[in-house]
């Protein structure tokens, strides 16, 4: 149904005229720290202006997707500033066809054709990329330096966010820090260049535009926090009061939200208070798992605080979550409470001998021969020495991190959170430690810090303990010490886990093959009862105990393992020169693949250009460290 509707929209006749769209913005910013060949200085730009040939405007540096022309480029004190004209009916058709009709739903009057196009192109291609020709270090810049300007999602140069509008003045107006001389000069030059175009339009083709716009989305789908980056580039360019750039998380136009539902509380007994319709449902709240929250929740009751039980505001709209920077993990509140309850519940793991190897199936010899002295003892064999219950629980490690965080907050002058216990004592005791004023109305009250005996005078104020004062005025070195202690604790736990895989009193001698006393007699072959993979193998880096025998070769570290011979691979025989390939299997011949438009081959001309458009890269190691940490912590449970 949807494909038929899209086909009808594509096959609909094109509009008679194209909507002229003006685009304006900085092509680069001076002293912005652009790396390498992307950096431009005022002298280079001054030598390259005005361009020798008109600069085309294309999409994502595709020469076959030209949609407009640059009208003027002016050297502003902040960087080169340009104004261009876009007039392409096919670009409007592709964007309108791909966009859903729900994007433009609104309570007020319907948006015009120009407004819909401005919303789509502004939010899909909010940046530009200037393509320059590569030149040597000794080659001076000339008027052929600039090649073209490309509309893209995110440019590599800073501050290259552009504005689109149907009038020239409206496109330039949002740049509040633009020099007045630059504003007048670019307006005059753009008006003169527009007269020379005489209503020209561009038509690169619907198919070429479709593939180019799709490649733009694919190349930037891995971009993290795209709207945050766009907002930052927008501030760098000095844009204020922009109308069509939507840096929000909702996939609708401002003012397109449906009418708010009436407030219905469950305590007022209003009809429909228990309505479970999708419109009235509220998603489960998300909480940020911080170390101090885990520590405070594990030491207190597993029930959440009253403020956490009702995160929805009085208006019925859920509070927006704080923006994450990648240092927090977002999980539902119900799963968070289950994790806290499971961590705080007491565990009584079975006691195991210190350094005992892990339990496993051991391959013994003949059933009637008894246990061999060379095999390791069973896991239940009593060993003298200290017994321990495995690694310490997760609460101890988190408590160390919480102490470091609390010390860091005290060092920075920030008040400790409600769940932080990094500093001894409560707020009540710290309140009594401060010096009281000279005229204290509560002078007659007994001091709670000193014992009171009837008939005796009030004791003198106790001086502040130097150790307490030093602890309260902790410096950065104590914070570092606490962090080092936490890391050391984790390293010790890892060492204990590794030690458990070794024998308690050194490695065991290698296991020799079992020789049956009646092996000389002919007996029918019996299949092995135990798999060979369960044979105990001592670590190869530890030598057997005891002095080596003189004149004898030490036994190998690993016992010989029988390998079942498999079928030998066929030998490669060189084929004669007159050999023919095997005939294809009988059947209908598959139809040839549909020919798709191939991307433009990077020729010598393309290699001589410096394009400033960016593409997000795939990072396969994003969460590998976090997964390893979680697996180690959960493995000790």
UniProtKB/Swiss-Prot annotation:
<keyword id="KW-1048">Host nucleus</keyword>
<feature type="compositionally biased region" description="Pro residues">
    <location>
        <begin position="566"/>
        <end position="594"/>
    </location>
</feature>
<keyword id="KW-1035">Host cytoplasm</keyword>
<feature type="compositionally biased region" description="Low complexity">
    <location>
        <begin position="277"/>
        <end position="317"/>
    </location>
</feature>
<keyword id="KW-0118">Viral capsid assembly</keyword>
<dbReference type="InterPro" id="IPR001847">
    <property type="entry name" value="Peptidase_S21"/>
</dbReference>
<feature type="region of interest" description="Disordered">
    <location>
        <begin position="502"/>
        <end position="608"/>
    </location>
</feature>
<feature type="active site" description="Charge relay system">
    <location>
        <position position="61"/>
    </location>
</feature>
<dbReference type="GO" id="GO:0039708">
    <property type="term" value="P:nuclear capsid assembly"/>
</dbReference>
<keyword id="KW-1188">Viral release from host cell</keyword>
<feature type="region of interest" description="Disordered">
    <location>
        <begin position="414"/>
        <end position="479"/>
    </location>
</feature>
<feature type="compositionally biased region" description="Basic and acidic residues">
    <location>
        <begin position="432"/>
        <end position="450"/>
    </location>
</feature>
<feature type="short sequence motif" description="Nuclear localization signal">
    <location>
        <begin position="428"/>
        <end position="431"/>
    </location>
</feature>
<feature type="region of interest" description="Interaction with major capsid protein">
    <location>
        <begin position="617"/>
        <end position="637"/>
    </location>
</feature>
<feature type="site" description="Cleavage; by assemblin; Maturation site">
    <location>
        <begin position="612"/>
        <end position="613"/>
    </location>
</feature>
<dbReference type="GO" id="GO:0042802">
    <property type="term" value="F:identical protein binding"/>
</dbReference>
<feature type="active site" description="Charge relay system">
    <location>
        <position position="148"/>
    </location>
</feature>
<dbReference type="GO" id="GO:0042025">
    <property type="term" value="C:host cell nucleus"/>
</dbReference>
<feature type="compositionally biased region" description="Low complexity">
    <location>
        <begin position="595"/>
        <end position="608"/>
    </location>
</feature>
<keyword id="KW-0720">Serine protease</keyword>
<comment type="similarity">
    <text>Belongs to the herpesviridae capsid scaffolding protein family.</text>
</comment>
<feature type="compositionally biased region" description="Basic and acidic residues">
    <location>
        <begin position="457"/>
        <end position="468"/>
    </location>
</feature>
<dbReference type="InterPro" id="IPR035443">
    <property type="entry name" value="Herpes_virus_sf"/>
</dbReference>
<keyword id="KW-0378">Hydrolase</keyword>
<protein>
    <recommendedName>
        <fullName>Capsid scaffolding protein</fullName>
        <ecNumber>3.4.21.97</ecNumber>
    </recommendedName>
</protein>
<feature type="active site" description="Charge relay system">
    <location>
        <position position="129"/>
    </location>
</feature>
<keyword id="KW-0597">Phosphoprotein</keyword>
<dbReference type="GO" id="GO:0004252">
    <property type="term" value="F:serine-type endopeptidase activity"/>
</dbReference>
<feature type="site" description="Cleavage; by assemblin; Release site">
    <location>
        <begin position="247"/>
        <end position="248"/>
    </location>
</feature>
<dbReference type="GO" id="GO:0019076">
    <property type="term" value="P:viral release from host cell"/>
</dbReference>
<feature type="compositionally biased region" description="Pro residues">
    <location>
        <begin position="537"/>
        <end position="559"/>
    </location>
</feature>
<dbReference type="GO" id="GO:0006508">
    <property type="term" value="P:proteolysis"/>
</dbReference>
<dbReference type="Pfam" id="PF00716">
    <property type="entry name" value="Peptidase_S21"/>
</dbReference>
<keyword id="KW-0645">Protease</keyword>
<feature type="region of interest" description="Interaction with pAP">
    <location>
        <begin position="326"/>
        <end position="345"/>
    </location>
</feature>
<feature type="region of interest" description="Disordered">
    <location>
        <begin position="262"/>
        <end position="326"/>
    </location>
</feature>
<dbReference type="GO" id="GO:0030430">
    <property type="term" value="C:host cell cytoplasm"/>
</dbReference>
